Swiss-Prot record:
Phosphotyrosine sites (modified residues): 415
Protein name: BTB/POZ domain-containing protein SR1IP1
One GO CC term, this protein: plasma membrane
GTP-binding keyword on record: no
Lineage, highest ranks first: Eukaryota, Viridiplantae, Streptophyta, Embryophyta, Tracheophyta
Deletion consequences: No visible phenotype under normal growth conditions, but mutant plants exhibit enhanced susceptibility to the bacterial virulent pathogen Pseudomonas syringae pv tomato strain DC3000.
Pfam families: BTB (PF00651), NPH3 (PF03000)
Keywords: Coiled coil, Phosphoprotein, Plant defense, Ubl conjugation pathway
Length: 604
């Protein structure tokens, strides 16, 4: 049919539709759309809707009135009403709120050029291309409305066009986008500068209305156009805060969430974690801690939780105490309040990153300061969890063993944690109290801490004697230094190290790094051994066969402390201790060196 004939036919149909409306001709077709019913006329509908034309021709011709049902039209009765108005020539407004359902309904009803000139499909496409997809906020609105119109919105490529328009315009608006990729080595420096003053673009709040799958596709399209991944941090933070709102991740109450809603939030969280920037300092530790709490609460995949733990370990030097106080979310009374196992894994990750940083960087001052901050943080954390009576001795000692020895200038923080733990667990045996007190080096206690420890009746006698002995040695040294204080030697010119001494220093630093590596390997083996022992205990307790009284489990049930056993870890530790020719004390499994005994003043 030629274009001229189509125009003539369209004009005739329009005049006929207007005449039907003006003369109030009785309806001859009833259309049921969901729960709504429309009494209409066949001619205006069939002249523009190929789908209705098929339904009318297939219906019975005997009856004067035809009844047809359209149960699954996109947009429901609202969309069909607008399409019917278009068929009758009644004016209505197209907007960003209704253009998505109009376009999908027109596709469903087959309102194409084959049936009428300038039909609804063409009119809707013109509005999309000329108005809706020309602004960022309108494109986001159309995409949001299209989420309820799948799969037909995908078929007409409405979703993909909206996503492409959003990605293009966000890259034009934001300063995080550059067509050429910058040097990857400079990423960390840039992120450190951005993290101090995070920039949130005006469109970030608009993106939070999207469903998680649409949100993910938009961010991926933005990165494909050159948007820097570390610039997505504020956007992800806004989306997570809005979508995960209402979760009881800071309390210890029972879960108050429906299974369906829990599944939806779990998918949202796992997707957000997969989109997090890989650069260091791109996200704050507090935000990562919030995500980790939610991941434990929602029981996400293990990979999701381990990813968050690795990220927190990488930035542990920036954390505060509240970031580590993660509830255990165990709803039985025999579990500790805080999840110490998670913190233990975070600290393990931190130690691995620090060892790798020592190898790759010569800036030892920054690493030492960072490690000192982590040491103080862990001491405060241990003091916080020490008051919990459900924290076992094994967990308390295991955490203390992981605190780097070089990070603790004084032992006051560890003494405070030990004292709180002894006060909260008054029924411990003498052997157990000695184990707890062996975590601190009495030689590094300050004068105030020594004065408190000397009068602390919760400490074992041996520990009090050590404190008094070292305090006596300190006073004796101070008196000797005051009486025999020589004149300061004249300043000497800086001497250049001889080649032999320089090589000796290099060898010594190399051996120190090797010792640190061996410590980490031992800690990993201990963690694996503890997990294996926990699994074997669970299997033994669940079996119906009676346990052998001589087994370690039956010994623990009698209430008596188990005898020390020779394990593979202990044997490896003793062998590794002999590898160091410079008498650098290797990691002894407790994170502390025992004070040397003075045979003339030994009391034990």
């Amino acid at each position: 049919m030629s274009a001229k004939k189509k125009d003539l036919l369209s004009s005739a149909m329009k005049r006929t539709s207007e005449w039907i409306s003006s003369q109030e001709v009785s309806s001859d077709v009833t259309v049921h759309v969901g729960e709504a019913s429309f009494s209409l006329h066949k001619f205006p509908l069939m002249s523009k809707c190929g789908f209705i034309k098929k339904l009318v021709s297939e219906s019975s011709k005997d009856s004067d009135s035809t009844v047809i049902k359209i149960p699954d039209i996109p947009g429901g009765s609202e969309a069909f009403e607008l399409a019917a108005k278009f068929c009758y020539g009644i004016n209505f407004d197209m907007s960003t709120e209704n253009i998505a359902m109009l376009r999908c309904a027109a596709e469903y009803l087959e309102m194409t050029e084959e049936h009428s000139v300038e039909n609804l499909v063409v009119r809707a496409e013109a509005y999309l291309n000329e108005v809706a997809l020309k602004s960022l906020s309108s494109s986001i609105t159309v995409l949001h409305k299209s989420e309820k119109l799948l799969p037909i919105a995908e078929r007409v490529k409405l979703v993909s066009r909206c996503i492409d328009a959003i990605a293009y315009m966000t890259c034009q608006e934001s300063h995080f986008c550059s067509p050429s990729s910058s040097n990857s080595g400079n990423n960390e420096v840039v992120v450190q500068q951005q993290s101090k003053q995070p920039v949130v673009d005006w469109w970030a709040e608009d993106l939070t209305v999207l469903r998680i799958d649409s949100f993910q596709r938009v961010l991926i399209a933005m990165m494909a156009r050159g948007f820097k991944q570390y610039g997505l941090g504020p956007v992800l933070m806004l989306y997570a805060q809005k979508s995960l709102r209402g979760l009881e991740i800071f309390g210890k109450g029972m879960k108050k969430i429906e299974p369906k809603q829990e599944h939806e939030k779990r998918v949202i969280l796992e997707t957000i974690v997969s989109l997090l920037p890989r650069e260091k300092n791109a996200m704050s530790v507090s935000f990562l801690s919030m995500l980790l709490r939610a991941a434990i609460f929602l029981e996400t995949t293990v990979a999701c939780r381990l990813d968050l733990e690795n990220r927190m370990g990488l930035q542990l030097g920036q954390a505060v105490l509240d970031d580590l106080l993660i509830p255990s979310y165990s709803f039985t009374g025999d579990h500790s309040m805080f999840d110490t196992d998670t913190v233990q894994r975070i600290l393990m990750n931190y130690l691995e990153f620090e060892v790798e940083g020592v190898r790759l960087s010569n800036n030892g001052v920054d690493l030492a300061g960072d490690m000192e901050r982590v040491g103080k943080l862990l001491e405060n954390y241990m003091a916080e969890i020490a008051s919990d009576r459900n924290v076992s001795l094994q967990k308390f000692i295991g955490l203390a063993e992981l605190i780097p020895e070089q990070s603790r200038v004084t032992e006051d923080g560890m003494y405070r944690a030990v004292d709180i733990y002894l006060k909260a667990h008054p029924n411990m045996s003498d052997v157990e109290r000695k184990k707890v007190c062996s975590l601190m080096d009495c030689q590094k206690l300050s004068r105030e801490a020594c004065a408190h420890a000397a009068q602390n009746d919760r400490l074992p006698v041996q520990t009090i004697v050590q404190v008094l002995y070292y305090e006596q040695q300190r006073l004796r040294g101070e008196v000797t230094n005051d009486s025999d204080s020589p004149a300061p030697p004249p300043p000497q010119p800086a001497a250049v190290l001889p080649p032999k001494l320089s090589s000796y220093t290099d060898e010594l630093s190399k051996l120190k790094r090797e010792n640190q590596d061996l410590k980490l390997e031992l800690l990993k083996m201990k963690m694996k051994l503890k997990e294996f022992e926990k699994e074997s205990e669970k299997k033994t307790s669940s079996s119906t066969i009676s346990t052998n009284p001589s087994s370690p489990i039956s010994t623990a049930s009698t209430g008596k402390p188990p005898l020390p056993r020779k394990s593979f870890i202990n044997s490896v530790s003793k062998k590794l201790g002999k590898l160091n020719p410079f008498s650098i004390t290797p990691y002894n499994g407790r994170g502390r060196t025992k004070p040397p005994k003075d045979r003339r003043h030994s009391i034990s």
